[in-house]
Amino acid sequence: MQIIEIREPEQTDFKQKQQIAVGIDFGTTNSLIAIATDRKVKVIKSIDDKEITPTTIDFTSNNFTIGNNKGLRSIKRLFGKTLKEILNTPALFSLVKDYLDVNSNELKLNFANRRIRICEIAAEVFIYLKNQAEEQLKTHITKAVITVPAHFNDAARGEVMLAAKIAGFEVLRLIAEPTAAAYAYGLNNNQKGCYLVYDLGGGTFDVSILNIQEGIFQVIATSGDNMLGGDDIDVVITQYLCNKFDLPNSIDTLQLAKKAKETLTYKDSFNNDNISINRQILEQLILPLVEYTINIAQECLAQAGNPNIDGVILVGGVTRIPLIKDELYKAFKVDILSDIDPDKAVVWGAALQADNLIAPHTNSLLIDVVPLSLGMELYGGIVEKIIMRNTPIPIAVVKEFTTYADNQTGIQFHILQGEREMAVDCRSLARFELKGLPPMKAGNIRAEVTFAIDADGILSVSAYEKISNTSHTIEVKPNHGIDNTEIDIMLENAYKNAQIDYTTRLLQEAIIEAEALISSIEGAMAELTTLLSESEISVINSLLDNIKAAAKARDRILINNSIKEFKSKINKSMDTNLNIIINGVLKGKNINQIQ
């Protein structure tokens, strides 16, 4: 079974039109730029007639040189990283050790005779691609759709957008690479079904489960490893060559390993001088890495509810290795789809989406998902989840919150990310305060809170209080992002601690209910003691003391029983007078509504 039947265009006449938008695949190892017109895609070649440009940046003779396989490489791995993260991650530190300014308080590299940010260096790649496109198409280009790994955090996405902006691009949309690949396949026919996109690039691995129904592409689950790719396979082969043939661990040996990998993709053996390696050895060397990626894919499928998949879509040049196709078939027993050149599938999708955004001619819709739940901290440290994990984006959710104490003139908002039940166990994203609220009884102030995630995965939170007409909006800053490794750890911790978290939340909710009840009743009694007899006051105080003792003991069953006893005895012995108190203080609420 095939998703599409498609041929790569050889010579395509692209009509000149008023608006032009390109698709860009800014890859860890290689980058591509393409344009689409009427669903026909053309990958734009460089001056040396190559469609694929190595993502390397060199600086010589006061000029930047892109794509000569010298200088700084794999810069994509650095997007969204802090100086501390790079210093503490050997794989990242090795990329920039010759350029890193370790005495700086921020991440800057000593590059091009100055201290320069990562986004400024990456912008040179975008400038190069932009110049190539303008030269080939003989027109000015400013609009682009750019692809990013599915697990790029806000920090990384922000740096991609900034780099593109520095290069002179207006970014129409950031789309996940697996989503772009599915777009490239799906738009060419009206296929329905569920597909696993297996994207193994030079430096990142992404897997997505996509539901394709009548032009709608919905990512229902994502996973991956943003520190794994074809580069790691090159390292494994390099280590083998060094050990087996006593070669130095050098750039030349690494290049030899790359050549061996590429040759063994379509041949059974590779020979170079006195060095020989066959496909069987290659497969033995890389099998653990391949199995690791398949385990991630299977876990992603489980997250999506284990739907029946109709095929696996291959993305990334590394997927040409026969072992990968064989192992994927063994694992999933479905067709392995690779009709489009796996190096170009992502940029095809980006170009098609760019064309659609400037001249919509299709009903197709791309939907990515939220990788971790987003919510707010409530009184007592409880997390109220507002946007759940794997919710399709863009999305906006509105909820109403109220004050906990009397005469509050401000509400503090703590935005959280994670699957745990208590704020202390989740990741803090941002804090802000809604100030200038009128002093009123607890529960009378209502704040309308909106969580919104745009198509680029950027979160903004706004709060609005109607009585005072007070509002506040915050966009989560990029340095609050989270990478794929942290996502996996957080999900694992949430799973392991699910029962404990649930019990802790129930206890905290019981304590909060007890405190609210005590505060409300004591406040009412202080204002309206003349309505109650001494014996009634004594009974109420005794019952409240029981609730206080249970809350202090942090015994949920005891708390619930003491509250139940309070309600039962109060309703039986002093229903009329207590109702007067409650109606006067809580304005229409009965005791069961006190929160």
UniProtKB/Swiss-Prot annotation:
Q: Which family does it belong to?
A: Belongs to the heat shock protein 70 family.
Q: What is the name of this protein?
A: Chaperone protein HscA homolog
What the entry lists under NCBIfam families is as follows: PRK01433.1
Record keywords: ATP-binding, Chaperone, Nucleotide-binding
GO-annotated molecular function: ATP binding; ATP hydrolysis activity; ATP-dependent protein folding chaperone; unfolded protein binding
Quote the function comment for this protein.
Answer: Chaperone involved in the maturation of iron-sulfur cluster-containing proteins. Has a low intrinsic ATPase activity which is markedly stimulated by HscB.
Q: Which HAMAP family match?
A: HscA
A Pfam entry, by short name: HSP70
Q: Is Hydrolase one of the keywords UniProt gives this record? A: no
**Which lineage ranks, top first, belong to the organism behind this chain?**
Bacteria, Pseudomonadati, Pseudomonadota, Alphaproteobacteria, Rickettsiales
Q: Which Gene3D superfamilies match?
A: 1.20.1270.10, 3.30.420.40, Actin, Chain A, domain 4, Substrate Binding Domain Of DNAk, Chain A, domain 1
The protein's organism comes out as Rickettsia akari (strain Hartford)
Biological process (GO) annotations held by this record are:
iron-sulfur cluster assembly
Task: State the source organism's domain of life.
Answer: Bacteria
